[in-house]
Amino acid sequence: MRPKLKAGLLPVWRDRNTLQFGVDPRRAVALRGMGEVAAIVSLLDGSRDQSGLIDAAQEQGVPAQAASRVLGLLAAAGVLDDFPAALHAGLPDLVRARLAPELATLSLAYGDGDGGARTLTRRRAAFVRVHGAGRTGACVATFLAASGVGHVACADPGPAQPADLAPAGLVEADLGAPRQEGAARAVARAAPEVSTRDDGALPDLVILTGPVLPDLAGRLMRDRVPHLAAWAGEAIGVVGPLVRPGRSACLGCVDRRKADADPQWPMILAQATFDRAEPQACDTVLAAMTAALASAQALALIDRAGAEPVTVNGTLEVVLPDWQWRRRTWPPHPACPCGAVTMR
């Protein structure tokens, strides 16, 4: 082990003898008896194994037994990581520096003790395809790429319009070109090392940010590809459901539930699938909010095998000018042929 203080935790003194790691009480850990051994904290940079660290502490005047005790206390408190030297060595300097906040966040959020290495490795191995590359879709693509996902492709051959432009997505130079090409350039700006090629291979996850044609939904179900819906319009943002084919409510289940509540829903849906209001009531902030939450749900699935993000059998929704996202539950529908209802 190469002990390293968890990145993102600032050491602060509570008094002359008590050192606190982290500022917010929801993350912070305080240890007493640190006054005479505080020098060891500056050595927790991951450059030494435990034996080398104890030797270095002795050079700073900290007895070996005291140094070993402090390391044990810090490890038990969950503020140490085993420095992921192999991961760092395999990343170019700029990429490593850019992904440092991602690693720091993963280390604190999941507490795996490896500095976020295994989770980032999962992200770098993942392939996500985003259908739709307008305001929301292009932002999703860049957010995922910047978060460490190694392969992000967009599918949207339509020409980019001025209303598609957004700070984290398409730019003025993309106008008139296929939106998917503009999204690929946006990904390259955010994370040049990320692949945007799409050879038709099955992705690990599909994100649907526009109207979903029945043949696409059916193909995803047949191929057992997890897929997440994300939509913003009418001054409303909706993220979900996250469909795990055959295991959770699918898009058809949701539409059947809506039809149960409103018998005219199938007629409305058929029209909305092939037409839309212009301009869309999806301002820059709503698009970014929806894209950010959709990206978070996608990463929740990628980061943990067998994870059940909150959008499984549900949606997260915000209705402007409200600020609060609320969850709606969508159980599998008994009349849907997707088979999820039998898994419950």
Task: List each model region and its residues.
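Adenine nucleotide-associated cytosolic modules
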Residues: 1-344
